[in-house]
Amino acid sequence: MANIKQISEIVNTGGNDVILASLPIFHSFGLTAATFFPLSEGIASAHVADPTDAFAVGKMVAKYHATIMFGTSTFFRLYTKNKKLNPLMFSTIRYAIAGAEKLNAAVKREFKMKFGVEIYEGYGTTETSPVVSVNTANVLEPEFFKELVFSKEGSVGLPTAGTIIRICDPTSLAKLENGQAGLILIGGHQVMKGYYEDEERTKEAIVELDGVRYYNSGDIGFLDEAGFLTITDMLSRFAKIGGEMISLGAVEAQISAVLGDEVTFVCTNVADEKKGEQVVMLFSG
């Protein structure tokens, strides 16, 4: 319920809003944002059983004048590539929010070009209900006519209301300064009580610091001076080569700069007799 209220404040829903509910409910993003959220807030929702059926999604948005859609980078890519989708089908959408995976820059750009709709990237985990932070539209301050910035390129936005983000050293859990990348701890009412009948795993995931109960996300990132959160990697996605820690995410970023977005790939680490580990790339296409 806490996360539902946080989502409501983010999108600032009104009586005329209609939620496109196409995400699977076995995923926390689909269950909380696309299912429980409209039910709890008394907002109309239009349901599509298969989010990969791009034309069915487009027809549902157009028929019921959906104004808010939650999706993933993978699904948004399908909509940009589908030739059956007329750009006017998404003309009523005022908020398209991406989560569950990193928003591909090309997908964000192509979706805006085709439909005229900006995709706002967010971040979350199942253990935090899941929404932790999100970019939203900038607004004009009515008294002094200054732009209030709520979105930053490359970031996953500002923490939701009542959410505490602590960036700390992965080993000592000492708090780090703004701009320094470290382990992301998440505090707030939306944090889970624990894993079902698994006290040992719960103790590993939940830590209390300075009177705040945090979830250890296992992700690496930093906060800037304005409070925007940027994800840089996952703690588990490092290879130790010859004693040096190599970020798999950084390797992937360099490969993406060369190959572009047409090749789907992922880097992983495997054992190596000489250097301990080595990085290998798995790809398709």
Model-predicted segments: where are they?
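Conserved AMP-binding/adenylation subdomain of ANL enzymes
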Residues: 2-18, 26-68, 82
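Short hydrophobic/charged patches on amphipathic alpha-helices used for structural packing
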Residues: 54-58, 85-87, 203, 252
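Active-site glycine-centered loops adjacent to acidic/histidine catalytic or metal-binding residues
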Residues: 100, 124, 157, 219, ...
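Conserved ANL (AMP-binding/adenylate-forming) active-site segment centered on the GW(Y/F)…HTG consensus within
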Residues: 116, 148-153, 174, 191-218, ...
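Beta-strand->loop->alpha-helix junctions that form or flank phosphate-binding loops
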Residues: 120-127, 157-159, 268-271
